[in-house]
Amino acid sequence: MTEDDHSDATDDATLTGPLAPDDIDAESPFTLPGFFDALDDDRLLAAVCTDCDNAMLPPRTACYDCGSRAVTVADQPRSGIVESYTEVHRPPSAFADLAPFTVAVVELDSGARLTGRVDADYDALEIGSTVELVVRDPVAEGIDPAAALSYEEDWPLHVFEPV
């Protein structure tokens, strides 16, 4: 990032101009590694469009509602409502031992939406259920690290728990 334009882009600041490709590096919260690094530090970060207030998870460099590139990063609440959910019976190999499991699209209290596994049986969940995001260690959850891509090995696992 250039020091005069976006030096504080990772800390809840409004940018002075649209993000450019040179403003993004591997540590930026606008990348998946940066998003998961923040999550590992107990921060759930979303990009928030300064033109239309749309919150995007994981963060994006441009708003997918209005197309603006004027975005900032902000911490998000961990609680939300189940908008949609399904039961996965044939997951990717890293999650094979967990099947069947429930996955949901959750609208957080801020309006941002995030998809994740829910620590509840499919039949126990319903649209409108209140859940809260927790961060867990993938190995402790039974995820095979050999099935992860090399850059994903240290990423924490986000899971929603019913409240």
Please place each PLM-identified region on the residue numbering.
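A broadly conserved sequence feature marking short terminus-proximal activation segments
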Residues: 1-44, 150-153
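Short, conserved beta-turn/loop elements at beta-strand boundaries and strand-helix junctions
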Residues: 85-90, 138
